[in-house]
Design a protein with these regions (language model features):
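C-terminal target-recognition/interaction regions appended to catalytic cores
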Residues: 17-140
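Flexible, glycine-/basic-rich loop-and-beta segments that form/coincide
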Residues: 1-27
Length: 140
């Protein structure tokens, strides 16, 4: 396995997606602009060139602005469902069929896909080792 980077920036995760208000955004499932994001004390959003704040369950991720993005020009907007899913390492072909609010709740409650995969692979490998050891022991 290749060594993992200590972290990934928000831009690394979502930087190749088009602006959700552009015509190109329609080509990406669940990539729809949601208006209303505002900065206020304790609600500041994630910066593109830093790791994303934790995606919290719920539409707005209050408190802390976790489900909000600070753009390069200083403007803020809510993450799209697709952007939130990317941050949680869902594949782009994973389709969320619920409303924006419910989809954001599902993503915020989810274990990141790549983390679940790593844990599952580790558990599987250890169980396999135990099984092999038991078989060797029982054959002696």
């Amino acid at each position: 396995n290749a060594p993992l980077r200590p972290w990934q920036t928000t831009r690394d995760a979502i930087g190749d997606l088009p602006d959700p208000q552009s015509k190109e955004a329609a080509a990406f499932d669940n990539h729809i602009f949601r208006a209303g994001a505002k900065i206020y004390p304790g609600h500041s959003g994630s910066v593109l060139d830093e790791p994303s704040k934790t995606i919290k369950a719920g539409a707005h991720g209050v408190p802390g602005g976790e489900n909000m993005l600070v753009l390069d020009n200083g403007d803020v907007r809510y993450y799209t469902v697709r952007e939130s899913a990317r941050i949680q390492t869902f594949p782009d072909d994973y389709h969320f069929v619920a409303s924006w609010t419910e989809s954001m709740r599902q993503i915020g409650n989810a274990v990141p896909v790549k983390l679940a995969e790593a844990v599952g692979s580790s558990v599987y490998a250890h169980l396999k080792e135990i099984d092999h050891a038991k078989r060797r022991y029982s054959n002696n």
